[in-house]
Amino acid sequence: MAASGSQSTGTSPRSSARRAALEEHGVVTVGTVFRGDKLSGAGTPEELRRAADVVLVEADGAKRLPLKAPAEYEPVIPPCADAVAAVAGMDAVGQAVGVVCHRPERVCALLGAGAEHVLTPEDAALLLASPQGGRKGVGEAMAFRCVLNKADTPQRAAHARAVAGRLAERGIHSAITYYREEERGGLCWF
């Protein structure tokens, strides 16, 4: 959440605490830890939108793996979402599905390949663009973009450009992200 000038955020103690944290820090992460490793939302997306200019919701994690296909109950995209960004790590390209993908059986089904299949830029683009993959649950009124992350080496950058080209052929805009060498190891934006 990023701070907003709006003060119409409700009167509950939680909403007051969120508002105070936003005013003090400008950026706040909200959620409740459950099952030891999961984070659940804190308040409805509509309530959070009244408190902040921007609300980012992680609707579908990948267990820290660079690529995935969602389960039948994923992703949990709030109906009020304006935009959805599917994220893929470029370290997945050139690696076997069974090694770098969360829910590899679903990835294999979408690609028509086995767990030993080595992912190509076309595979990554197909997974991101698929209504059963990265585009799953995206409403027609929602903007859809892809973030091609971890393009930190020349080879990964080339893979990212290839994936971006394949996505562009499908009318999907993407952004390529990476750290420069001097930014690695401890960069904190906030």
Per-segment meaning from a language model:
Residues M1-T32:
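N-terminal phosphate/diphosphate-binding loop that engages ATP/GTP or pyrophosphate donors
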Residues T9-T11, T29-T32, T44, T120, ...:
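Residue-identity detector for threonine
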Residues E24-V28, R50-V55, A83:
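Loop/turn-to-beta-strand initiation segments
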Residues T29-T32, V55-A59, L65, A86, ...:
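General beta-strand structural signal in soluble alpha/beta enzymes
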